[in-house]
Design a protein with these regions (language model features):
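Hydrophobic alpha-helical transmembrane segments of polytopic membrane proteins
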Residues: 123-146, 164-167
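Transmembrane helix segments
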Residues: 13, 21-29, 146-186, 190
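A residue-level signal for alpha-helical anchor/packing sites in multi-pass solute transporters
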Residues: 63, 106-107, 141, 191, ...
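Helix-to-coil boundary motifs at intracellular loop junctions of multi-pass secondary transporters
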Residues: 67, 111, 144-145, 199
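Alpha-helical transmembrane segments of multipass membrane proteins
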Residues: 20, 106-111, 129, 140-141, ...
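Transmembrane helix-boundary elements of multi-pass transport/secretion proteins
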Residues: 1-73, 84, 89-102, 109, ...
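Hydrophobic alpha-helical segments of integral membrane proteins
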Residues: 1, 5, 72, 179-199
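Short helix-to-coil transition segments within interhelical loops
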Residues: 75-84, 145
């Protein structure tokens, strides 16, 4: 993964950049729309949760399939390296990179927009870590289902757009049609956003 600049961009640069851009556009002055909180105050945990989803839906499946298509995984099987050692190392790398992206997004919000923590930052990080573990498991499942890295990227981008729009991170759930709101009950990102916003 460390050799994939696109993956690193979307996990380490895109989230804090998104916080900076949206925070600059909408500001962080308290508004009734967010119950007296600023835009960044209200949405920062949700925006940081996007790192978790991007890692599981986009980055991990594409990375695994690229390794499979290049023959790297087959060559690894021919070495004395145990399978569980590779899996443990791969999970660890993706987990650490994902959590770094979450932390960077939070730091940008706190430093640039003076975000006032509504609860425990530690709990937000714990929730992000639990969500990341779940999304990594989903990512490995998708990697086993997708036929190719190109399919993983194409389908993953479409899925991510839908998940972002219906997560409640940017568009209030009340603004969505009732049928869409009902369907989002099955969205893992919506539940992660609600968890992190509530901490």
């Amino acid at each position: 993964m460390l050799r994939e600049p696109v993956g690193l961009f979307f996990t380490l640069i895109f989230p804090p950049l998104l916080v900076a851009i949206l925070g600059t556009i909408f500001g962080n002055d308290p508004t009734p729309q967010f119950d007296g909180k600023g835009f960044v105050d209200a949405t920062l945990p949700a925006m940081s949760s996007l790192v978790v989803a991007i890692m599981g839906i986009l980055i991990l499946p594409a990375t695994q399939l690229q390794l499979r298509e290049s023959g790297a995984l087959a060559r690894l099987r021919a070495t004395p390296l145990k399978s569980w050692t590779y899996v443990a190392a791969d999970v660890t790398v993706h987990f650490l990179v994902g959590m770094t992206g979450v932390v960077l997004a939070l730091i940008v919000g706190m430093l640039m927009f003076d975000v006032r923590a509504q609860g425990s930052v530690l709990l937000v990080l714990v929730a992000g870590a639990c969500g990341l573990i779940a999304f990594l498991a989903l990512g490995y499942t998708l990697a086993a289902v997708y036929p190719s890295a190109a399919a993983a990227t194409g389908i993953g981008n479409g899925v991510m757009i839908v998940l972002m729009i219906t997560s409640g991170a940017f568009i209030p759930m009340e603004a969505l049609p009732s049928g869409v709101r009902h369907a989002t009950q099955f969205s893992p990102l919506r539940h992660l956003v609600e968890l992190m916003q509530g901490l």
